[in-house]
Amino acid sequence: DFNGSIWNALEEAVQAIGRREEIYIVTGVTFNKGNENKEIKYVKPKKDASQKCPIPNYFYKVVLRVKHSGNTVTDARAIGFWFEHKAYGTKAKDFENYTETVDKIEEWTGFDFFINLPDKLEAAAESASPNWSEFKNW
């Protein structure tokens, strides 16, 4: 089960950081990765089978940590996670194997995250090596 395993483990790990400092998180879904044209599956409600709801093919989460001097952001680090919507079994901690740069997730989704950061900090944070151990210990 996707939500009860790998996604839940990721959310708990991110929340652990958020309990001790300010972080910014963007979570979303998408049906295609970049320009691909993947089949979209639907679920129909039991009460009205004429209706249907699309099931996302991918889930992503991008997380930003910042350091301040007063009200000025002096440094930033970001990491992204990208998952195909499927069962991941009991290897919940394996979320560390699904990291991506935020730049890559922006490319795949068409979104521009963290636009309020100074450009130089945004560019460095979004292109940083997507290593979970480095990110959580930064």
Predicted stretch roles:
Residues 2-138:
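Domain-level detector of nuclease and nuclease-like folds
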